[in-house]
Amino acid sequence: MDINRWSLQGMTALVTGGSKGIGYAIVEELVGFGARVHICDIDETLLNECLSGWHAKGFEVSGSICDVSSRPQRVQLMQTVSSLFGAKLNILINNVGKYILKPTLESTAEDFSSLMATNLESAYYISQLAHPLLKASGNGNIVFISSVTGVVSGTSTIYGVTKGALNQLARDLACEWASDNIRANSVAPWVTATSLVQKYLEDEIFAEAMFSRTPLGRACEPREVASLVTFLCLPAASYITGQTICIDGGFTVNGFSYKP
């Protein structure tokens, strides 16, 4: 067996929003497979706490403050990444996202602008800025962290629109940038047990509504998302591009009221 197919040794990665939840798990998984990782986050205190913890473990992780919804800060971020990694980048994980759970008639123009800027605009322009670095690496990979609500209807139209757009962006970039040896895929998790979601998981009514139609009958764990994301970046996944892969415990394929 060629073990290099299952290694990220010598590769570089940028993970946006890497200091908590799914992003944090992705960082640890990428490092575990040998990658050098740079993260960005808007929370300086949390970022520094994570970096201290990782450095204590001997992980090669660096970080910088960035509000990805800000164009100047996105440009500065990519300049930093270029300087750190010798103008080359193998892996870009567009992980940053937020949600505002409102139905259409209750959503405001401010809600729309905020979600579009953070969830979609940031991923679009960071990918654009990263293109020269990804191309220069000779083996570029982009993974968008989407959501099941970008595949099937959910409880927030704006949030779902941003995530559905990420899925389409993965398809478009997969075709447009294939000649530059850049792959692009989207990972669409179902409800994931992060600190932000934990309060909802403790609500029995919410949990019943979410998991009564989920064959595996539970929330996804951040490390489970991280495993899929990392696999897509491995040489072993070199023929996978333009895909949206749901990691949802069977939720999107359950066509009847299944009770786990």
Swiss-Prot record:
Coiled-coil regions listed in the entry: none
Enzyme Commission identifier(s): 1.1.1.-
Annotated Gene Ontology cellular component terms: extracellular region
Domain of life where this protein originates: Eukaryota
Binding site for substrate: S147
Record has NADP as a keyword: yes
GO MF annotation: an example: oxidoreductase activity
One Pfam match: adh_short_C2
Gene3D superfamilies: NAD(P)-binding Rossmann-like Domain
Keyword tags: NADP, Oxidoreductase
Binding positions (NADP(+)): 14-38
Record bears the keyword Oxidoreductase: yes
Active site residues of this protein: Y159 (proton acceptor)
Root EC class: oxidoreductase
Family note: Belongs to the short-chain dehydrogenases/reductases (SDR) family. SDR65C subfamily.
Protein name: Tropinone reductase homolog At1g07450
Organism whose genome encodes this protein: Arabidopsis thaliana
